[in-house]
A protein has these predicted regions:
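General structural signal for alpha-helix termini and helix-helix connectors
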Residues: 28-32, 70, 142
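N-terminal strand-loop-strand
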Residues: 65-103, 131, 135
Length: 214
């Protein structure tokens, strides 16, 4: 769940870090709880996290408690994969139906996937191109320069080689197109792709440099 900018009441949200950490402690604690007392205490921590978020946003605390209840097991950051695929020096982007913004194709990695297999599948599903992942361009903290979200996530951007295929939108994407560096659309799907990721992708295409990481 994304926290829209108009939901934020302060510029530097220490409260978001606190709420995330409390929720992570709660989720992990519930996973290892050995008795009803521990379960109740860790459930209360989840409620406190929801109350913090509800106080600083227009999100409903009760809805957040339900969302948190669906998160089970040891709490870790989520993994988002993105494929930077080029044709004649232009970058493949897809337009998201959900917000109308452009992004490199990708999505959450599924359990059981190799990271490379995840990004190759996402590019095929969202854009219609069979690709092979060749290199990790960067590993980013997804919220460092993007919209704030409740759950912490890492973003892995791969340099991919197009093997075959033609542009083909999906139920998630409305358009598929290639853009030179100077033609990149101004309206990006910010929680998925940022200008930083696009810049690094073009650099990786032209230069042999080490993987970038936060």
């Amino acid at each position: 769940m994304k926290l829209n900018h108009d939901q934020l009441e302060i510029d530097f949200p220490h409260w978001l870090n606190w709420a995330r950490e409390i929720q992570a402690i709660s989720q992990t604690g519930l996973h290892f709880a050995e008795n009803d007392y521990q379960t109740q205490r860790f459930q209360r921590l989840s409620e406190i996290s929801a109350e913090i978020l509800g106080n600083y946003t227009n999100l409903d605390s009760a809805d957040l408690v339900e969302i948190f209840a669906d998160q089970i097991g040891y709490a870790t950051p989520r993994i988002d994969v993105r494929g930077a695929a080029f044709r004649d020096g232009s970058l493949l982007l897809v337009r998201e139906r959900i917000d109308g913004g452009w992004t490199m194709p990708g999505g959450w990695a599924d359990v059981g996937d190799f990271p490379s297999a995840a990004v190759e599948r996402e590019v095929l599903e969202e854009a219609g191109f069979k690709v092979e992942a060749r290199k990790v361009i960067g590993i980013y903290d997804a919220n460092r320069t993007g919209p704030l979200e409740i759950f912490h996530a890492f973003k892995i951007v791969f340099l991919c080689e197009i093997i075959s295929g033609e542009p083909r939108p999906s139920f998630e994407t409305s358009e598929v197109a290639f853009f030179s560096h100077d033609e990149i659309p101004q309206v990006l799907s910010g929680e998925r792709t940022r200008q930083r990721h696009i810049h690094d992708a073009f650099v990786a295409l032209s230069e042999d440099r080490p993987t970038i990481f936060d």
